[in-house]
Amino acid sequence: MSEIIDVIPYYIIPRVSIETISAVACFILVKFMIKPYQVTGEGRYIGLPLGFGFLGASYAISAITYTELASFELIWRFELIFRAFSFVFLAVAYYFSKKPSKNSRCIWNIVFSGLFVILSTAVLVTFVAPQLPQSSYQILNFFVRILSLICIAYIFVHCLREKTIAQDPYAKWVLVAYGLLALSQYSSIVWAADFSYFAFWSTLIFRLMSLGVLLAVTYKIFFCTKKGRVKDEEDPKKR
């Protein structure tokens, strides 16, 4: 960690700015992605907003960490917990994204409840456990990066195998977004392994590009859906 601390004065402003922008982008995505759940009440739709909500929270915590507004020893655990669970929730959401059956709803409820039990336990342990050595942070940090990459890779493959990707132009851009996010996560693993500054900046650039694409696609889908609904209401033939 000493290498990171030594370079903080050089990049703290752009890093905090990027973390803040990333957090805001994720929270905007949550605003859009919560709508299908609000309309249908289907539990399978809650995974995406939860995933991006936790991801945004992890970026916000990261920004706070670099501004030194809170104790690093405590807050880094929350960052790792939220970052790990964000990608797990996203992967689970895509796994259960197909039209639900009675059995799949039951399995989803069990998995969803189990994830929240594990999340609550992890947060509780963060408060009651003694301070962990720096080596533990490095191990957990690397593990979370690997887990995140595995989850993103699964989402990418899942999107790639969807039959609607050829007909839906937006699906292709979602695939691009997750591809960029996978590159970002891979670069972060390289950065954690050998402190390559090229990998470090690649991580941030790919992340911003990914979130930008997701924002554009999500807004376009929401805007077109809303616009189409207004046209249907105005067209007397469709009343």
What are these language model-derived features?
Residues 1-6, 114-141:
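Membrane-helix boundary elements
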Residues 6-38, 141-162, 223:
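First transmembrane helix
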Residues 10-26, 43-114, 142-146, 197-220:
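Individual alpha-helical transmembrane segments in multi-pass integral membrane proteins
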Residues 41-44, 104-114, 135-143, 156-180:
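Membrane-helix boundary/juxtamembrane motif in polytopic membrane proteins
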Residues 55-60, 115-128, 178-188:
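Aromatic-anchored segments of alpha-helical transmembrane domains
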Residues 61-70, 123-136, 186-197:
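Juxtamembrane "helix-exit" motif on the non-cytosolic side of transmembrane helices
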Residues 152-239:
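C-terminal transmembrane-bundle signature of multipass membrane proteins
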